[in-house]
A protein has these predicted regions:
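N-terminal Rossmann-like NAD(P)+-binding subdomain of aldehyde/semialdehyde dehydrogenases
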Residues: 1-114
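Conserved small-residue-rich beta-alpha loop and adjacent elements
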Residues: 99-164
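Short internal beta-strands
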Residues: 144-153, 258-265, 271, 342
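Short acidic-hydrophobic, aromatic-tinged amphipathic segments that line or gate anion-handling sites
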Residues: 1-4, 173-178, 298-303
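A conserved active-site cap/scaffold subdomain adjacent to cofactor or substrate pockets
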Residues: 222-294, 298
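Conserved NAD(P)+-binding/catalytic subdomain of aldehyde/semialdehyde dehydrogenases
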Residues: 170-257
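C-terminal core of ALDH-fold dehydrogenases
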Residues: 304, 312-423
């Protein structure tokens, strides 16, 4: 039986009509006016009107010199892990060709998109990991032109660490611009910036809405909502660590969602007490406490099977398993963005360092999609060719199949081949 010790507060669905209209106006102005429209919104929202929005070679060369050696080493380490895992993913996306019947050859080719745009948020804080995840991954996939943009810091250009991360990740063009106007510039193109084929990266609700409205003009990765974590824990789990991981996600956003699925009331109650204790001294408690109060859930279940059901219903962005037998959950849980198995891993590792991508589905989207990977930046295309003898045999069946659907011109395209290749 499933029992709630703590439930999230039910909130009315937010009316985003005003957000949609604001985004629509920004997109239209930049589509129609180009750089003039971009400059208008950059001045309005970011107090930023540089001679050129593209970051200069001098700025790029200077970025590394502004950072402590340890920070550079750490960035390089994190990027190496992300690159290594992406390369392993890429090895498993392969071309192939097969002869399905004598004389009929079918094949698959993996072709990278020509150009992608990476949006790295961070006007308030440097979001280094977002640069790692959204720049390195397309480069490993073989994208020849990767455009990266990030908002200015209080009218002073990019964070040096963010800029270095973009450069080290392999970005081909870097622009200092943020928000909806940055996405519009990448999608439609402006003077000196050719449009991209797809865009990836997270942001606020305006950025998410812009991606939704631009989908079709460009491809997108996914529409991200507030971050989520669901932790499955049994009595072997350490309440101190479980609580720390809950708060690690809660500090993201007052709307962040957290759930503990406990296999006993004991671990549930101990963890709740530990969350309250850790919140007292947490530097980010102003955000984390609100997220936990409003959106935190604690659910006690009787069995691993019930835990799997709750988890799959949630379809969390991040799934942590802190149980004696985490392999059971790896084998049976189906809906999640990324799984962190055992006490020895934590969401923070995946967010920043360990190598898996942190751009993950939220809002139950894990029911039908995974997170960002090299696979998002390639097209799986197919081809076919046949001998004359095989074409003759296929044409006879295909002509009838077309006629069953009253697609008569289709049928004729088969018949002319049947007639031509008749023995």
């Amino acid at each position: 039986m499933i029992k709630y010790l703590k439930k999230a507060i039910e909130k009315p669905q937010e009316d985003i009509t005003a957000v949609q209209e604001t985004v629509r106006e920004i997109l239209a102005k930049i589509k129609n006016e180009g750089e003039a429209g971009l400059r208008f919104y950059s001045e309005k929202f970011d107090n930023w009107s540089p001679k050129s929005f593209r970051v200069s070679e001098d700025e790029i060369r200077a970025a590394k010199s502004k950072l402590p050696a340890t920070e550079v080493e750490d960035i390089d380490f994190c990027q190496a892990q992300i690159r290594n895992f992406a390369q392993e993913q890429m090895k498993r996306l392969v071309d192939f060709e097969v002869e399905t019947v004598p004389g009929v050859h079918l094949g698959q080719k993996i072709i990278p998109v020509s150009c992608s745009g990476s949006y790295i948020p961070g006007g308030r804080y440097p979001m280094l990991a977002s640069a790692h995840m959204t720049v390195i991954t397309p480069k490993v996939a073989g994208v020849s032109r990767v455009v990266a943009c990030s908002p200015p810091v209080k009218g002073q250009g990019l964070w040096p660490a963010t800029l270095y991360s973009m450069v080290a990740g392999g970005a081909d063009e870097i622009y200092c611009m943020g928000g909806v106007h940055a996405l519009a510039a990448m999608a439609y193109g402006i003077e000196g910036l050719q449009p991209v084929d797809m865009m990836v990266g997270a942001g606020n609700k305006y950025v998410a809405e812009a991606k939704r409205q631009l989908f079709g003009t460009v491809g997108i990765d996914l529409l991200a909502g507030p971050t989520e974590i669901l932790i499955i824990a049994d009595d072997t789990a350490d309440p101190f660590i479980v609580a720390a991981d809950i708060l690690g996600q809660a500090e993201h956003d007052p709307n962040a969602r957290q759930a503990l699925v406990a296999l006993s009331a004991s671990i549930a109650e101990k963890t709740m007490k530990e969350v309250d204790r850790q919140l007292v001294d947490l530097p980010t408690k102003d955000i984390a406490a609100v997220a936990w109060r409003d959106n935190g859930e604690v659910i006690v279940v009787d069995s691993p099977e019930e835990a799997v059901k709750v988890s799959d219903d949630w379809a969390p962005e991040h799934l942590e398993v802190q149980t004696e037998d985490w392999k059971y959950y790896l084998d049976n849980c189906k809906n999640y963005g990324s799984a962190f198995l055992g006490e020895e891993t934590t969401v923070a590792y995946g967010d920043k360092t360990i190598g898996t991508n942190h751009v993950l589905p939220t809002m139950k989207a894990a029911r039908y999609t995974g997170g960002l990977s090299v696979g998002k930046f390639v097209k799986t295309v197919t081809y076919q060719y046949a001998t004359k003898e095989a074409s003759y045999k296929i044409a006879d069946v295909c002509e009838r199949a077309c006629n069953y659907e009253n697609m008569l011109a289709h049928g004729i395209s088969c018949k002319v081949r049947k007639d031509k290749y008749a023995k």
